[in-house]
């Protein structure tokens, strides 16, 4: 068995590991690092463009980030947090475009309007949401309309074929984006692979993580080509392996992982094959999720640019699969039960029977049934223009709540060892769009001393000018930041007045 020592091991070749790798390599160029990926390349699971449930999340159009309180008011706090997080991501990407670490921005980001669209009784909700968000500087420029004619100008495919008297409403922000996180991850990985002291190994599946006698971590991986096992010792390990993060976290044995479980959710897209509607539609149009639907299954008619080509997707339709990865095993879910999380998992399961029923119903939908759902957004959709494509796999967090009862959580969370030597990212949605802030969270949990040094402070400020300063609190800083990122990323800029 081959052995070696490095400062950092990154497990998983997705956007999270790539982002953390770049952050650490910029902050500590002399550190040795190794990235281990089980597949033949990076970004082939949830980070991939076809597998990502939503791209460019800024809470501009995703209605599940702005719930209505019991008193009828709209809670916009989560939307503010997500929007701030995306601004941080844009700064980080802009810095690396400027430094030529990334290719031209058109290789991974494009301007695409973000819209919300509702019908009937949901109009009052959207009106209240628009009123609440439009007062906040982060959401400046959000247009609202109940006019079918105006909505038709924004998105013809949504309005065509509707009765003119139908009660509808839409919001639109012109400066939304579409992000290809697969391309971004590939480019960051290529950049890292060229750096001294960085090793990227594909076809290497991590099978065990254990403490060494010195207090470091021994990471054991299987070379799926040769069948040989390799062991590497590291001072710090990050597990950014998507659905595989949870079982690997268990193997580490850290007490902080006790009680955590996972609930897998699969997805499927309807993909348009007719060039005409693809060309006509240019927006990400989000609607209201069905009661009981998980957040990554909010239906949307979605313009994306994948490998330089404009695409039109609808969905994702949720489903249930016991895999924790798209290219995983049907046994993943069952093998995730252990003595530390059994109670948590059973309690969460009993409390979420309606969700399970919803997912099973989604799985049972025929192609014709899915087209009928699409017609709620695009009334003149033609059956022959659409085909079904499998999306990525998500594993939602299950953990004890404040009453110590197992609870299904929607979102992401960093779980770290007490000494900061190991961290894992669990969960899904908003995911990739907030990768930079999530990985800054890893630094804050695991590298507290280093963050206090002038070297780290100055470098982080260089990469992310607003780091430590919320943009929503400073109109001048917000405009300065958006002007800077828009210029480098070739995005439209609208100053906040």
UniProtKB/Swiss-Prot annotation:
Entry keyword Flavoprotein: yes
Catalytic activity as recorded in UniProt: (S)-malate + a quinone = a quinol + oxaloacetate
Pathway recorded for this protein: Carbohydrate metabolism; tricarboxylic acid cycle; oxaloacetate from (S)-malate (quinone route): step 1/1
Annotated GO MF terms: 2-hydroxyglutarate dehydrogenase activity; L-malate dehydrogenase (quinone) activity
GO biological process, any: tricarboxylic acid cycle
Cofactor(s) in the UniProt record: FAD
Xref: SUPFAM superfamilies: FAD/NAD(P)-binding domain
Superkingdom of this protein's organism: Bacteria
Keyword terms, alphabetized: FAD, Flavoprotein, Oxidoreductase, Tricarboxylic acid cycle
EC number: 1.1.5.4
Keyword hit for RNA-binding: no
HAMAP family named among the record's database cross-references: MQO
Family named by the database record: Belongs to the MQO family.
The name this protein goes by in its record: Probable malate:quinone oxidoreductase
Species: Wolinella succinogenes (strain ATCC 29543 / DSM 1740 / CCUG 13145 / JCM 31913 / LMG 7466 / NCTC 11488 / FDC 602W) (Vibrio succinogenes)
